[in-house]
């Protein structure tokens, strides 16, 4: 019992550390993007939805369902352009080549080369090309994308070592420009390039009392126009088992240590250099039927000139088996200081022209939920969480000739409810549903600009005699409020209508190594808007062949 008293004291100290007043997190760089008078081939990244599909559980699984944490620094995930290519429901045993063509003069080419199964090495190379040419002269919504990726990994009795590298280039346009602005029309083109590299080592050991670690070094160079961001990060999770004592069992003591150095440069402006140090200790154990994880989320921030700014938040998660092997309830406390970056801004809304690099502080997040499993066919999760966020980013339209976006930050309280359900009819059919419901309360802003209050996704997959694989996706989003204008006393507002998007396709494997695919997006041909003044492409479809070798 005395150990429980010590642990309680430890958590009380963590709560008192959290009680420190949040510090000034503002580090704003506002930039009005300039462009050379050239019109390049374009890529519209987000205007059709890529649906984050619920993953129906495979039949006869035996794992326990782990609840998925809900991020609130960006309440709505970015919706990139529709995957005109559709990932097959079966796994390729080795390498493949995929080619296709669509109704918007859409060529698709993809290949994936890898070695056969090997217990010592794995390596591979992948390339993807996708382009549209819809001749929508009034929208300039077409895009071009190239993506190449390579990897190498080796396995031994001491651990796994791996290298990865990728390069992705997206060309797209501003196309929400004002029709009367001929200057804007000549400066629509934007190009995003992103190079990423990773080296990692995961140690392994058959001895339960030996300390292990998972260490990774990550680098990326991200560029859009004249704005360039470089990021160097290394993190290591060190962990080991702790001998049982008294009523505490299955103890694991761990700590994740991270170093992140980010540079940002635009035109002739002075470079912005930032350092983020993280230290997250954890103690995981089982007490009676409770599984407990307790510790701290610690971030120390340096921006090159100010003194170090520490941010410390407690972390607690407790799970309880309500009905053994059927239902589990969980709850806890979380929170963290988070980096805002050029990469995350553009990946969320690539029509942004003012880059506000104000960091985000999730002061506290309270969460509770229940997971359930019914036999080997169905599983579900329900979660409610409340977050208090400093400097939550909101996208608003500027009044420039492109109708581009900028970011304003505000204090936010967010209540979110998530429900997800998956059901499998043996291997013949699988269906998944996820829904998110939000309630926002901002300190200064009257509306959650460009954020929905409801979003839902449905995914269905079928397997007909291991030859025909139809699939169906539906994505829906509630209406949103939109603001145009930087002045807090003089701006206009609009309503973006609620919308839904239906996608469907079929994969037909008429030979063991040769299959036909057809994918159709936005079947209802609704020119809805995810971002104000940027209507999505209409109905689009692509079909082709996949050859496995």
Protein language model features and the residues they cover:
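Short loop/turn motifs that connect adjacent beta-strands in outer-membrane beta-barrel proteins
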Residues: 85-92, 117-120, 155-160, 204-211, ...
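Membrane-embedded beta-strands of outer-membrane beta-barrel proteins
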Residues: 111, 148-150, 197-201, 232-240, ...
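Exposed, low-structure sequence patches enriched in small/polar residues
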Residues: 92, 97-100, 128, 291-295, ...
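Flexible loop and strand-edge segments within Gram-negative outer membrane beta-barrel domains
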Residues: 132-149, 164-212, 216-231
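N-terminal periplasmic/intermembrane-space "pro-region" immediately following the signal or transit peptide
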Residues: 18-87
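Outer-membrane beta-barrel transmembrane domain signature of Gram-negative proteins
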Residues: 189-200, 216-288
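Outer-membrane beta-barrel translocator/receptor signature
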Residues: 77-81, 88-97, 101-148, 159
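Surface-exposed extracellular loop regions of Gram-negative outer-membrane beta-barrel proteins
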Residues: 114-134, 249-262, 272-303, 426-437
């Amino acid at each position: 019992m005395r150990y429980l008293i010590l642990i309680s004291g430890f958590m009380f100290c963590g709560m008192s550390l959290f009680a420190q007043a949040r510090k000034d997190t503002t580090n704003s760089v506002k930039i009005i993007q300039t462009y050379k008078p050239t019109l390049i081939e374009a890529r519209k990244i987000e205007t059709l939805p890529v649906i984050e599909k619920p993953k129906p559980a495979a039949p006869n699984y035996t794992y326990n369902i782990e609840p998925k944490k809900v991020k609130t620094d960006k309440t709505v995930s970015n919706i990139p352009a529709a995957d005109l290519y559709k990932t097959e429901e079966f796994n390729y045993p080795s390498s493949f080549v995929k080619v296709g063509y669509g109704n918007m003069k859409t060529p698709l080419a993809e290949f994936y080369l890898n070695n056969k199964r090997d217990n010592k090495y794995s390596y591979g190379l992948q390339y993807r090309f996708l382009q549209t040419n819809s001749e929508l002269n009034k929208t300039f919504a077409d895009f071009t994308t190239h993506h190449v990726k390579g990897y190498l990994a080796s396995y031994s009795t001491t651990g796994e070592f791996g290298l990865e590298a990728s390069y992705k280039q997206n060309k797209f346009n501003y196309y929400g420009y004002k029709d009367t602005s001929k200057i804007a029309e000549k400066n629509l083109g934007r190009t995003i390039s992103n190079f990423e590299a990773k080296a990692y080592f995961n140690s392994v050991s058959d001895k339960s009392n030996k300390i292990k670690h998972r260490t990774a070094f990550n680098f990326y160079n991200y560029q859009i126009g004249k704005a360039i961001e470089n990021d160097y990060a290394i993190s290591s999770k060190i962990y080991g088992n702790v001998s049982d004592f008294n009523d505490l069992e299955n103890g694991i003591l761990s700590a994740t240590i991270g170093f992140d150095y980010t540079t940002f440069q635009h035109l002739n402006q002075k470079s912005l250099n930032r350092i983020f140090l993280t230290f997250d200790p954890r103690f995981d154990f089982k007490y009676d039927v409770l599984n407990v994880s307790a510790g701290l989320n610690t971030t120390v921030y340096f921006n090159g000139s100010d003194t170090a700014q520490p941010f410390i938040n407690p972390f607690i998660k407790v799970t309880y088996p309500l009905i053994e092997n059927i239902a589990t309830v969980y709850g806890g406390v979380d929170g963290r200081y988070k980096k805002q970056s050029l990469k995350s801004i553009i990946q969320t809304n690539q029509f942004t022209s003012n880059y506000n690099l104000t960091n985000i502080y999730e002061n506290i997040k309270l969460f509770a939920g229940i997971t359930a499993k019914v036999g080997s066919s169905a599983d579900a999760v329900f979660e409610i969480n409340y977050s208090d966020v400093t400097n939550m980013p909101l996208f608003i339209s500027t009044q420039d000739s492109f109708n581009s976006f900028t970011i304003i930050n505000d204090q936010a309280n967010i209540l979110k409810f998530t429900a997800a359900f998956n059901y499998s009819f043996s291997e013949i059919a699988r269906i998944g549903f996820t829904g998110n419901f939000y309630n926002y309360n901002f300190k200064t802003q009257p509306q959650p600009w460009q954020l929905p209050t409801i979003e839902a996704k449905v995914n269905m997959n079928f397997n007909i005699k291991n030859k025909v694989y139809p699939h169906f996706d539906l994505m829906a989003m509630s209406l949103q409020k939109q603001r145009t204008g930087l002045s807090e006393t003089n701006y206009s507002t609009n309503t973006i209508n609620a919308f839904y998007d239906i996608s469907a396709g079929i994969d037909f494997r008429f030979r063991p190594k040769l299959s036909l695919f057809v994918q159709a997006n936005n079947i209802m041909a609704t020119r809805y808007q995810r971002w104000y003044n940027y209507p999505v492409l209409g109905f689009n479809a692509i079909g082709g062949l996949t050859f496995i070798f």
